[in-house]
Regions:
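Intrinsically disordered, low-complexity repeat and linker tracts
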Residues: 372-378
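Solvent-exposed loop/turn segments at secondary-structure junctions
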Residues: 74-75, 124-127, 156-160, 185-186, ...
Length: 378
């Protein structure tokens, strides 16, 4: 073989190498996309959940109770944590110790109000993003040490391994809703919410709410609903569809004469005007804080927004570390109650987002309609 032919052959080989690299990248990327979609499955609707605990107590009409709603942000969000899906940088909690510290502190915060009921959201049970910490176990152990509580867990999603960001993939996530009750939870049900379709469902993940039944001494039931509506990959129509499904279940229970309390992270501007209140002059719009559609709330139900100590935001935008008075904040979390539940006090508590990207909401209530005093002129 001549020198000219050898040189020509070498050039041909070098020319093939980048093509092979491109082909391998395409095959790997295609294989990953196929894995994500083929491994995708939704948890079944109307799934019976198994409450745990030894409480045998029934709730009473006319007695004051305290309930807390708290999104724990899967134990990652210290006040300087920024999240990649919110234009921030980080995709995982900084360390296992940081996760444990955040969950311990947020749980202690909830317990500090001596609650009768607590609705937690974003509780991880073995996720890459939270360093495989079993957050449910930490919370349950603390509540067991504080008194006699029943608890029930509803898994929101079990996602495929997300290979993004490339430098530190978000990984696989397994997370859900955890309800705590001093009173006997006789049964609980997981309802699957309508979510995005197509590629968007990978971002939206699965969504659900849990319906827990607690007997009341008058023969009725207290229906506790723990929910976390979609934040990403959604639009107004889908958000309304989720609320309409939720409201249909709430109304069905109210029509039976039961007492209904729904709490959690609604991923809407809960008071409708909190975005402008906390961020005057802002032109920012996000799908997770569109105004709450008050017009679809069914008759017989009320949002609890008469805050005893004024407006306090319940979440921050995590594109940057939290700076009071500068960071974008809004009210997403709260309670909606049936008319046979009297809200005696409600307040969002300013915890400066030190251990989660949400602030807790505390409500005191009684079962039974508020008494009204009529006056007559003589």
């Amino acid at each position: 073989m001549s020198d000219k032919e050898k040189t020509k052959k070498k050039k041909f080989r070098w020319w093939k190498i980048p093509l092979w690299i491109i082909l391998i990248v395409i095959l790997v990327a295609g294989g990953y996309v196929a894995y994500v979609f083929l491994s995708y499955s939704r948890i079944e609707d109307n799934l019976a959940l198994q409450p745990e605990g030894n409480s045998t107590e029934k709730a009473k009409v006319g007695e004051e109770y305290t309930i807390v709603s708290y999104n724990l942000g899967f134990g990652a969000y210290t006040d300087d944590f920024t999240f990649f899906m919110d234009e921030g940088k980080e995709s995982r909690a900084r360390s296992k110790d940081s996760v444990i510290n955040c969950i311990n502190n947020t749980t202690d915060t909830a317990l500090s109000y001596n609650p009768d009921f607590v609705l937690f959201q974003e509780v991880d049970i073995g996720s890459t993003r939270s360093h495989q910490v079993e957050e449910r176990n930490i919370i349950n152990e603390k509540f067991a040490a504080a008194g006699t509580y029943d608890n029930v867990f509803a898994q929101n999603y079990n996602s495929a391994y997300l290979m993004y960001p490339i430098t530190e993939p978000h990984g696989a996530s397994k997370s859900g809703l955890l309800t705590q009750s001093r009173f006997d939870i006789t049964s609980s049900l997981r309802r699957s919410l309508p979510i995005a379709t197509g590629f968007k469902k990978v971002l939206d993940l699965d969504r659900c709410y849990s319906i827990s039944r607690i007997p009341v001494e008058d023969g009725k039931e207290l229906i506790l609903i723990d929910q976390h509506l979609s934040a990403y990959g959604t639009d107004a129509a889908q958000g309304n569809a989720q609320l309409e499904m939720l409201f249909a279940d709430m109304k069905a229970e109210y029509d039976k004469g039961n007492y209904v309390i729904c709490g959690g992270d609604f991923n809407h501007d809960f008071t409708v005007g909190s975005k402008e209140y906390f961020n005057p002059g802002t032109d920012k719009t996000y799908t997770w804080c569109e105004p709450f559609p008050d017009d679809i709330i069914p008759d017989g139900f009320t949002k609890c927004t008469d805050y005893a100590e004024g407006m306090i935001p319940t979440t921050r935008y995590t594109n940057e570390p939290y700076v009071p008075g500068k960071s974008f904040t809004v009210i997403l979390d709260g309670f909606i109650v049936s008319d046979n539940v009297t809200c005696k006090y409600v307040q969002n508590i300013d915890k400066a987002f030190k251990y989660t990207d949400h602030n807790p909401v505390v409500m005191k209530f009684e079962l039974g309609k508020a008494e009204t005093t009529e006056t007559t002129e003589e």
